[in-house]
Amino acid sequence: MVDSVYRTRSLGVAAEGLPDQYADGEAARVWQLYIGDTRSRTSEYKTWLLGLLRQHGCRRVLDVACGTGVDSIMLVEEGFSVTSVDASDKMLKYALKERWNRRHEPAFDKWVIEEANWMTLDKDVPQPAGGGFDAVICLGNSFAHLPDCKGDQSEHRQALKNIASMVRTGGLLVIDHRNYDHILSTGCAPPGKNIYYKSDLTKDVTTSVLTVNNKAHMVTLDYTVQVPAAGQDGPPSLSKFRLSYYPHCLAPFTELLRAAFEGKCQHSVLGDFKPYQPGQAYVPCYFIHVLKRTA
């Protein structure tokens, strides 16, 4: 339905099933350059995530949107037992390559990587003994990739229910989304640096909002990225690609998350890794939800 009104992705990207917006391979390659490796993660993000997981005694972590594996690699290096899944085989190949290259390291030899779909996650990923993972992470605005094809958010509810089912009692779900409240009210993303990536390759990001029947239905981001030349002497080139997102606003997404846990959770919201208060002066780029299953 979404493609009948507006082209949601770069040409060549798969249109059936759970949309893989990186299926043409080129978008996945450019995205890998854009986000970089573990060294490209901001120190604030790394310190926050590792501190959160260790504070709650998390050891077994499920990354349900691992992409190229950059977060999972960081967690494996830090001693966590990691299972990494993604719906895009083009993205997973980078994670698989890293695991192969470091297979002689015991931690990487034990790293589990699987292709999986949020809509069937409970069937695609076996739970560890003890009734679930200590922590499930879905970061980098990943969940917003899932569109609302039926117009009733039933896919969102099912996917979140499946993701929540992987969290053990006392375990955490850490999931985020861009500040779509600000994007929808202003038409632009909040000013400020990316809290996750230190990439200096981004030359431009253009934001568009699609409204259907007076309701925001989709946000597209058109990236222009400077790609380094293959050789030492060649000039860099500019690559363009488009990604589309469902605009999850803070209040309704909070309701979806609590429903996924049937209300049996503790829930807190951060704005760019800091406690968030509605109406505060600072406008965050991302909202991060931390939910702890209570029963």
Curated annotation (Swiss-Prot):
Description of activity control: Inhibited by 5-methyltetrahydrofolate monoglutamate and by 5-methyltetrahydrofolate pentaglutamate, inhibition is much more effective by the pentaglutamate form than by the monoglutamate form. Two molecules of 5-methyltetrahydrofolate are bound per tetramer. The binding sites are localized between subunits. Inhibitor binding may preclude movements of the polypeptide chain that are necessary for enzyme activity.
Positions of modified residues (Phosphoserine): 10
Binding positions ((6S)-5-methyl-5,6,7,8-tetrahydrofolate 2): 6, 217, 242
Sites where the protein binds (6S)-5-methyl-5,6,7,8-tetrahydrofolate 1: 4, 6, 242
List of residues that carry Phosphotyrosine: 34
Keywords: Cytoplasm, Folate-binding, Methyltransferase, Phosphoprotein, S-adenosyl-L-methionine, Transferase
Organism superkingdom: Eukaryota
One GO CC term, this protein: cytosol
Statement: the UniProt record of this protein carries the keyword Kinase: no
Subcellular location(s) per record: Cytoplasm
InterPro entries associated with the record: Gly/Sar_N_MeTrfase, Methyltransf_25, SAM-dependent_MTases_sf
Assembly and oligomerization: Homotetramer.
UniProt record similarity statement: Belongs to the class I-like SAM-binding methyltransferase superfamily. Glycine N-methyltransferase family.
UniProt protein name: Glycine N-methyltransferase
Lineage, opening ranks: Eukaryota, Metazoa, Chordata, Craniata, Vertebrata
